[in-house]
Amino acid sequence: MTFWNLSDRDSWLGANNYPLPFDREYKPKNVYRVIKNFNPALDNAEIKEDFVPSVMNQPGQQYPMVNSQGYARFRVEAPQARSVIVSLGLGGQGGTVLHKNEEGVWVGTTDGPLDEGFHYYHLTIDGGVVNDPGAKNYYGSVRWESGIEIPAHDQDFYQVKDVPHGQVVQVLFPSPSTNSTKRAFVYLPPQYDGKKKFPVLYLQHGWGEDETAWHRQGHANLIMDNMIAAGECKPFIIVMTYGMTNEVKFGGLASFNFKNFETVLVDELVPYIDANFKTIAKKDSRAMAGLSMGGMETRNITLARPEVFGYYGLLSGGTYSPEDIKDPAQVKGIFISCGSKEGPDRIMQAAEALKAAGFNAKGYVSPGTGHEFLTWRRSLREMAPMLFQK
């Protein structure tokens, strides 16, 4: 295989800003690997023209669209633009180059099918990053991003059904440690009537997201409604708050200080929730879990404050070892998970080591997914039944 003219700038980016095989440091891009592994038989596979609007589109908008194979198709009206690229994923990875038609409208389809579930994306138009006006916005990558949903074969568990529904309520709570007022969202199960007391799961978002992530991108409330209606888990309250107490820009996770959030969560939010909602204010009736960075927060806080939470959950957020906790009686249950594309062996090995040491532990691997919300939706479904069991 030979590539010509790779020593000049246009060969890195292309004359029209189209991405070519190598970056400015001569490192191969994903497109190089695609070309290297090109299979003519696969290339002849037809894309089914059964595209329908994404369920996350703005009302009345036809694009973006998705088909039954998992391809996404985009349409952007920008007649004066010179280039339009769609970047998918947290932080905007890669790019689907759109092409302008005779009407001055930019259209294009992803090179291959996307993983099932939710994906962030944005547009880069002539070098400027903007959202797609056809799609609803979701907070991720430390900014509002567009969202698209690829229908999953097992999506029934997070669909709206004709079952009793709980409420997601917004609360504002004082935070003396940050000299501010913080926001949290609280899921109250259908059985919550202000009389009976319920256990509580404190559920954290990932890096670059906020307290809206779990009930908007993650559909945590719908998952719980459906599981409670089916008798698959006990009813419990879920509290979701903003975990990025340090105002750190995208890419600054290494400098993030977890101690500040520990104070906000344990010393300020937990007492507020216990004082204002009907909760069972005991360690064994509290759980903490989180995805990605939220899992890292969970691990740090549960180890630092073992007297507060009885159940721990790390969703694509690392592992525990028996040496971390030492006494199996200290914790009622541990759940760890990741997607099958995230190096799942370490998750299952860690779960087995915990079980061998006498811990009530469960490991779960989401099939066919990576560091993305379908992994975490499934993880919540798998974790919920083990919480708050006598």
Give the positions of each predicted feature.
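Non-catalytic cap/lid and distal C-terminal segments of serine-dependent acyl enzymes
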Residues: 60, 67-95, 100-390
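Aromatic-rich peripheral "rim/lid" segments of glycoside hydrolase catalytic domains that contact
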Residues: 4-42, 387-390
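Low-complexity, Pro/Thr/Ser/Gly/Ala-rich linker/spacer regions in secreted
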Residues: 37-49, 326
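Short glycine/proline-rich, acidic loop/turn segments that cap or connect secondary-structure elements
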Residues: 2-14, 350-360
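Short, well-ordered coil↔helix boundary/capping segments
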Residues: 1, 29, 341-345
